[in-house]
Amino acid sequence: VFHPTGDWNCGRAIDAEVCEFNGKYFLYFATRDKDFKIQMQGVATASLNTDFNREDWTQACDKSILYPECDWEGECIEGASIVKKDNKLYMFYAGAYNNAPQQIGVAVSEDGLNWKRLSEEPFLRNGKPGEWNSSESGHPHLFTDLDGRTYLFYQGNNDHGKTWYITQQEVLWKDGKPYLK
């Protein structure tokens, strides 16, 4: 559906997430740098009357909108999932490559283009040794039900990727910030 361009990326887009915000669609994607080493987030936009064809999408930035900078993110930010809350977008994302360990972070944006991490620490860490997610808690997906409750679905494993499990937790909100019980 979309092919990013520019010197900042390798020309591929994976892990797509589409959301409607401020009168248009935003397509968030993961891409890598030219050396295929660092994975980061990019964004494209389309009008609300799109047929979701490739030619309907316009790259919204000529650089990454979220790049791995925190130690726990390693060389990778991927698997973004977006939830709208109080006229803001919250991006839950996987930091670090699978089983490095991968953990979940959160960033916030008021315009869909400029993002700020809510913390330099993971929102959801991998589990302790012996727990079901000791190798990874990653690839988040957010779901908001008809009652307005938000749920975080994510994958994990404790054997460095030989098996995978998926679980969910309700995301609670206080003062514009998400938290887990």
Question: What is each PLM-predicted segment?
Answer:
Residues 1-181:
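Carbohydrate-active catalytic/glycan-binding domains of CAZyme proteins
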